[in-house]
Amino acid sequence: PLYSSAASDVYKRQINAFSNANTVVSLANGNLGPSLVKELFKSGEILSLSNDLVKPFYKGRAHQALNWFREALVGVPYRIHQPEGAIFLWLWFEGLPITSQELYERLKRRGVLVVPGHNFFVGMDSEWRHQRECIRISYAQDSESVKKGIALVGEEVRRAFREE
């Protein structure tokens, strides 16, 4: 065999230890970031930065992503929620012949990460098809990566409908 079960146990312990350390580091933020922005909050300048820089930037990115989706999804039944300030879009592919989980798996193999919709319908009727026809996609990465990812989403969704 390529590795023994003893080695496998060592790897499992190492992975578990790394996972635990990552959880602690991710959940316990340091003091540097908060201390740097403390004055921005006290002075109210954080609001002008948000309204004058951050909000317009992501509004432009949202509109660009919407345009790329319009190009990538021609002929595909889809709807996109109205973006209202978040850094992601919700897409609904009505009648998608595969689940959003399968779409996620296909896209992941091609280097594109989306979030399958069913993860956001906790406690809902599991028979409701809509939850398996939606994905959430972020447009916060660099424009070229987002554009490429959107094109690949279009290819995979079109493929799913073709294979139906």
Please identify what each model-predicted range represents:
Residues 97-103, 144-148:
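Short, conserved charged micro-motifs
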Residues 17-25, 43-67, 96:
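Structural signature of PLP-dependent enzymes
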Residues 52-66, 78-93, 130:
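Conserved glycine-rich beta-strand-loop-beta hairpin in the small C-terminal domain of fold type I
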Residues 1-7, 11:
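Single conserved hydrophobic/aromatic residue that forms the stacking wall/gate
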Residues 109-110, 124-164:
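PLP-dependent enzyme catalytic core of the Aspartate aminotransferase-like
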Residues 8-9, 90-92, 138-140:
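Short hydrophobic/aromatic beta-strand micro-patches
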Residues 9, 35-45:
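Helix-loop "lid/cap" segments that line or gate small-molecule binding pockets
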